[in-house]
């Protein structure tokens, strides 16, 4: 099940959001918001209050003369209760 949550995202924006108890992950494209909430609550033992998702546009990549695209992904911003935290980001 945790294979569906690919990895945590560490960027300037995600570091700012950690102060507001919002954590950022890249997840499988097929997951829905209720499934993401269930996965995060079950794996990290926290209470999720909100789940925001977005799918950034795909980016072109050149390999020699051929033009390809980077794989698509879904980015999730999960808000948890104020008195809790996720230890991965600590």
Swiss-Prot record:
GO aspect biological process, one term: translation
SUPFAM superfamilies, A to Z: Ribosomal proteins S24e, L23 and L15e (SSF54189)
Name the keywords, alphabetized.
Answer: Chloroplast, Plastid, Ribonucleoprotein, Ribosomal protein, RNA-binding, rRNA-binding
Q: Where in the cell is it found?
A: Plastid, Chloroplast
One cellular component term (GO) for this entry is: ribonucleoprotein complex
Q: Which GO terms describe its molecular function?
A: rRNA binding; structural constituent of ribosome
In which domain of life is the source organism classified? Eukaryota
Q: Name one Pfam family in it.
A: Ribosomal_L23
> In terms of one coarse class, where is the protein primarily found?
plastid
Instruction: Name the HAMAP family for this protein.
Output: Ribosomal_uL23_B (MF_01369_B)
How is the subunit organization of this protein annotated in UniProt? Part of the 50S ribosomal subunit.
Family listed: Belongs to the universal ribosomal protein uL23 family.
What is the name of this protein?
Large ribosomal subunit protein uL23c
Classification from the root reads: Eukaryota, Viridiplantae, Chlorophyta, Ulvophyceae, Oltmannsiellopsidales
Q: Which gene encodes it?
A: rpl23
């Amino acid at each position: 099940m945790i294979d569906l949550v690919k990895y945590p995202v560490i960027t300037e924006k995600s570091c700012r959001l950690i102060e507001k108890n919002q954590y950022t992950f890249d997840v499988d494209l097929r997951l829905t918001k209720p499934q993401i909430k269930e996965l995060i609550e079950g794996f990290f033992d926290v209470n999720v209050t909100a789940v925001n998702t977005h799918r950034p546009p795909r980016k072109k990549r050149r390999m020699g003369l051929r033009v390809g695209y980077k794989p698509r992904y879904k980015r999730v911003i999960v808000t948890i209760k104020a008195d809790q935290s996720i230890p991965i980001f600590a």
